[in-house]
Amino acid sequence: RIRVFTHSDVSVDAVLASACLPFLFQAVEIDGEFFWDGGYMGNPPLYPLIYHCDSRDVLIVQLNPIRIPELPKTAQAILDRVNTLSFNSSLMREMRAIHFVTKLIDNGFDDDGRLKRMLLHTVDAEDVLSRLGVSSKLNADWDFLTTLFNLGRERAEAFLVQHFDKV
C-alpha cells in the first residue's frame, strides 16, 4: 500500500525509505511497518495535491524518459526497459487521475468544491536521458553528476523563458 509522508511524518527514515531501491537495500522500518522506494507505486504522488495543496500548478521534473526510440533486443536491454516502465507507470497513473478529475470538473462535478483543476508543467531532458542506460542511475561519478546538474539548470532556464507566464 502507498503511504505518502507529509509534514511531521517526514523524517530521515522516511527519506531513506523513499530512496531505498529494493534490489539494492533492505526496506526501512517506520512505526513497525516496512517501506522502500515509492517509485514502484507512487512516484510522484500527485493525486493528494488535489485535496491538500493551495496551488493549482504542479511542476514535474521528469527524470525517466517516457519515449525511448530503440527497441530493446538483449536480455539486459529488456530488463532496463522493464525498470523504466515500472518507474513511469506510477507517474502515468497519477496523470490519468488528474485528467479524470479535470473531466469531472468540466462536466460540472467538483465534489462540493473539494476538487480543483490542476495545471501540470514538465521540465525534462528526454532527448539526452533516453540515451542513458538504467545503470547511469547508479553512477556517482562527480563529472557525470555535474553534467546532469548543468543539464537540469539549462532545461529549467529554458522552461522558465518559455512558460513563466503560464505558471
Short names for language-model regions:
Residues 23-32:
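A short acidic-Thr-Gly-centered motif at the start of a beta-strand
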Residues 1-6, 24:
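Carboxylate- and glycine-rich phosphate/diphosphate-binding segment that chelates Mg2+/Mn2+
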Residues 12-24, 38-44:
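Active-site glycine-rich loop that binds ribose-phosphate moieties when present
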Residues 5-10, 33, 39-167:
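Non-catalytic peripheral regions of patatin-like phospholipases
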